[in-house]
């Protein structure tokens, strides 16, 4: 499987708790239902420790069968069918700062 990861930044004006609550609740349910070809969906909410520097507010992991499925997902994001997801993202994300990575995992220790 191929994984797409994205570093997410909360929308200005939201508290950490508002961001996490919306992402985990409403958006998580929507993403799980609407994203085509999605095999697994994981949210990683940052635990911000005192004295540590953080870029962003969380990582999302989306698993797909192969690279073609990732490409189809990215193309889908440009269609009208993706509008409900994109509109929902605008409620809690600063999408202009999102950074995406497509990776292949290699387990070294399991």
Would you name each region that the model predicts?
Residues 1-110:
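Macromolecular interaction modules
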């Amino acid at each position: 499987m191929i994984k797409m990861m994205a570093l997410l930044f909360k929308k200005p004006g939201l508290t950490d708790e508002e961001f996490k609550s919306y992402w985990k609740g409403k958006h998580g349910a929507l993403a799980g239902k609407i994203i085509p070809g999605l095999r697994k969906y994981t949210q990683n909410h940052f635990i911000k420790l005192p004295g540590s520097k953080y870029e962003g507010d969380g990582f999302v992991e989306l698993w797909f069968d192969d690279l073609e499925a990732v490409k189809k997902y990215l193309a889908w994001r440009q269609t009208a069918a993706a509008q409900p997801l994109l509109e929902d993202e605008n409620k809690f994300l600063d999408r202009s700062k999102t950074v995406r990575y497509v990776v292949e995992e290699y387990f070294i220790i399991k």
